[in-house]
Amino acid sequence: MNIKGSPWKGSLLLLLVSNLLLCQSVAPLPICPGGAARCQVTLRDLFDRAVVLSHYIHNLSSEMFSEFDKRYTHGRGFITKAINSCHTSSLATPEDKEQAQQMNQKDFLSLIVSILRSWNEPLYHLVTEVRGMQEAPEAILSKAVEIEEQTKRLLEGMELIVSQVHPETKENEIYPVWSGLPSLQMADEESRLSAYYNLLHCLRRDSHKIDNYLKLLKCRIIHNNNC
């Protein structure tokens, strides 16, 4: 089939590039290369790029959690302490696809933005604290740095999406505040490692939620639920 000049060409190229990025764990292109103030990207493309970026962040979060778990937490039983102890647990989030589909579109977008904003501070301190560790594992540090950077980009992209879908929406600065820094700095190694485990567990959980939520929203807004 000759796709030259076909309307499928752009979509096919985007799919190929997206798959290549995910397989190679290479950072996706910026959601809006010219910056938010001069963004000329269509809503469809904004969603396409946001979905690729959120999936990339979730993959990195899962890999970082697995590496930390294998290196530091074998047999310590941290998982029992991590359940329901995330700083974002106060947010009312859909528990399954059915609940998500019933959620108001505007509230759904605001929820994603709130989750992303709530991770700005913990990701900054995660990078700072891991960098200061003796014999800091490079695999974990490099992923933490990348996740922090890409989460900021995803937040910028989501703010652009909100401005296009609901231009009347005022910026909402209300989001859960993280207070876990003292726990990452504890002198007791067991307590400190437990705090790191909890933070990485929550990051993996929330990045998975955002990844799923964005796919559902893209289906609803771009494809009118026909996907």
Swiss-Prot record:
**Source organism superkingdom:** Eukaryota
Task: State if Secreted is listed as a keyword.
Answer: yes
| Disulfide bonds, paired cysteine numbers | C32-C39, C86-C202, C219-C227
State one molecular function term (GO). Answer: hormone activity
Residues in the signal sequence: 1-28
**Where does it primarily localize?**
secreted
Q: Which SUPFAM superfamilies match?
A: 4-helical cytokines
Compartments it resides in = Secreted
Q: Name one GO cellular component term.
A: extracellular space
Keyword terms of this UniProt record: Disulfide bond, Glycoprotein, Hormone, Lactation, Phosphoprotein, Secreted, Signal
Q: What is the documented function of this protein? A: Prolactin acts primarily on the mammary gland by promoting lactation.
Q: Which family does it belong to?
A: Belongs to the somatotropin/prolactin family.
Instruction: Report the protein name in the record.
Output: Prolactin
